[in-house]
Every structure is written in C-alpha cells, then in structure tokens.
Amino acid sequence: SNRPMPLNRWQFKNMISCTVPSRSWWDFADYGCYCGRGGSGTPVDDLDRCCQVHDNCYNEAEKISGCNPRFRTYSYECTAGTLTCTGRNNACAASVCDCDRLAAICFAGAPYNDNNYNIDLQARCN
C-alpha cells in the first residue's frame, strides 16, 4: 500500500536509525511474523519477539482514553545512540514513546536474519 506513513511511524523510524544506524528502518518494516504487516503466530526469532512486545505495548497504550499509538507523536531525544523520552509528553505520548524506545533498543540487541525478511505469513505465522 502507498498510504502516507503516520507521523508516529516516522518518529519510530528515526528512533531505529538512532539505535541501529547500520541498517535501514525498511529492514524492520517487513520482518518475521510481527514486524510490519503481521501480528499472529509464534515469533520466528528474538528480533521478531521485539516486534511482538512492541505490538502488545501499543495495545496497552490504547487503553489510555483517546490514545491512538499509531498516530500519537511524542517528544524524545537521541544522543550518541541513547534514546530518551522527554518530560513534555502527556500520558498517551509518554506510553507510546516508551513502546518505541524499548523496541528500538531491542532491535539493536537482536541478531538480524535475512531469511526472516518478507516471509510467507500464511505458511509461517498461523
């Protein structure tokens, strides 16, 4: 689909660039069962598990009244590869920022397996 990217996705992409400067954010946009379009089945590896946790984190944030994680922008800083959610966020923004921050840190610590990029969701994620 060529819908415009939600602003929050743009911020998340920049967070990933902060913690994993060696890779394009695009490498994480269609990985395993949970990174990007998926959201079911058993995570294929640690990186995919990062995305499953991120999905669950967004689901928790949605419980905050009026909070839509996919469109909620937030205030954060990247300093030498370290992400900080700043104090200017309301409850929703703070939650979403932390979801994205923790995922970006998780991505940095997880091995990337090229075989798990753009997998067959039907076959592997039931």
Curated annotation (Swiss-Prot):
<dbReference type="GO" id="GO:0005509">
    <property type="term" value="F:calcium ion binding"/>
</dbReference>
<dbReference type="InterPro" id="IPR001211">
    <property type="entry name" value="PLipase_A2"/>
</dbReference>
<dbReference type="GO" id="GO:0050482">
    <property type="term" value="P:arachidonate secretion"/>
</dbReference>
<dbReference type="InterPro" id="IPR016090">
    <property type="entry name" value="PLipase_A2_dom"/>
</dbReference>
<dbReference type="GO" id="GO:0047498">
    <property type="term" value="F:calcium-dependent phospholipase A2 activity"/>
</dbReference>
<feature type="disulfide bond">
    <location>
        <begin position="33"/>
        <end position="125"/>
    </location>
</feature>
<feature type="disulfide bond">
    <location>
        <begin position="50"/>
        <end position="106"/>
    </location>
</feature>
<dbReference type="GO" id="GO:0005102">
    <property type="term" value="F:signaling receptor binding"/>
</dbReference>
<dbReference type="GO" id="GO:0005543">
    <property type="term" value="F:phospholipid binding"/>
</dbReference>
<feature type="binding site">
    <location>
        <position position="34"/>
    </location>
    <ligand>
        <name>Ca(2+)</name>
    </ligand>
</feature>
<dbReference type="GO" id="GO:0005576">
    <property type="term" value="C:extracellular region"/>
</dbReference>
<feature type="active site">
    <location>
        <position position="54"/>
    </location>
</feature>
<feature type="propeptide">
    <location>
        <begin position="1"/>
        <end position="7"/>
    </location>
</feature>
<dbReference type="InterPro" id="IPR033112">
    <property type="entry name" value="PLipase_A2_Asp_AS"/>
</dbReference>
<dbReference type="Pfam" id="PF00068">
    <property type="entry name" value="Phospholip_A2_1"/>
</dbReference>
<comment type="function">
    <text>PLA2 catalyzes the calcium-dependent hydrolysis of the 2-acyl groups in 3-sn-phosphoglycerides.</text>
</comment>
<comment type="similarity">
    <text>Belongs to the phospholipase A2 family. Group I subfamily. D49 sub-subfamily.</text>
</comment>
<dbReference type="GO" id="GO:0006633">
    <property type="term" value="P:fatty acid biosynthetic process"/>
</dbReference>
<dbReference type="InterPro" id="IPR036444">
    <property type="entry name" value="PLipase_A2_dom_sf"/>
</dbReference>
<feature type="disulfide bond">
    <location>
        <begin position="18"/>
        <end position="78"/>
    </location>
</feature>
<dbReference type="InterPro" id="IPR033113">
    <property type="entry name" value="PLipase_A2_His_AS"/>
</dbReference>
<keyword id="KW-0378">Hydrolase</keyword>
<feature type="disulfide bond">
    <location>
        <begin position="57"/>
        <end position="99"/>
    </location>
</feature>
<keyword id="KW-0106">Calcium</keyword>
<feature type="disulfide bond">
    <location>
        <begin position="85"/>
        <end position="97"/>
    </location>
</feature>
<keyword id="KW-1015">Disulfide bond</keyword>
<keyword id="KW-0443">Lipid metabolism</keyword>
<feature type="binding site">
    <location>
        <position position="38"/>
    </location>
    <ligand>
        <name>Ca(2+)</name>
    </ligand>
</feature>
<dbReference type="GO" id="GO:0048146">
    <property type="term" value="P:positive regulation of fibroblast proliferation"/>
</dbReference>
<keyword id="KW-0964">Secreted</keyword>
<feature type="disulfide bond">
    <location>
        <begin position="35"/>
        <end position="51"/>
    </location>
</feature>
<feature type="active site">
    <location>
        <position position="100"/>
    </location>
</feature>
<feature type="binding site">
    <location>
        <position position="55"/>
    </location>
    <ligand>
        <name>Ca(2+)</name>
    </ligand>
</feature>
<dbReference type="GO" id="GO:0016042">
    <property type="term" value="P:lipid catabolic process"/>
</dbReference>
<feature type="disulfide bond">
    <location>
        <begin position="67"/>
        <end position="92"/>
    </location>
</feature>
<feature type="binding site">
    <location>
        <position position="36"/>
    </location>
    <ligand>
        <name>Ca(2+)</name>
    </ligand>
</feature>
<dbReference type="GO" id="GO:0006644">
    <property type="term" value="P:phospholipid metabolic process"/>
</dbReference>
<keyword id="KW-0479">Metal-binding</keyword>
<comment type="subunit">
    <text>Heterodimer formed between two homologous isoforms: isoform 1 and isoform 2.</text>
</comment>
<keyword id="KW-0442">Lipid degradation</keyword>
<protein>
    <recommendedName>
        <fullName>Acidic phospholipase A2 2</fullName>
        <ecNumber>3.1.1.4</ecNumber>
    </recommendedName>
</protein>
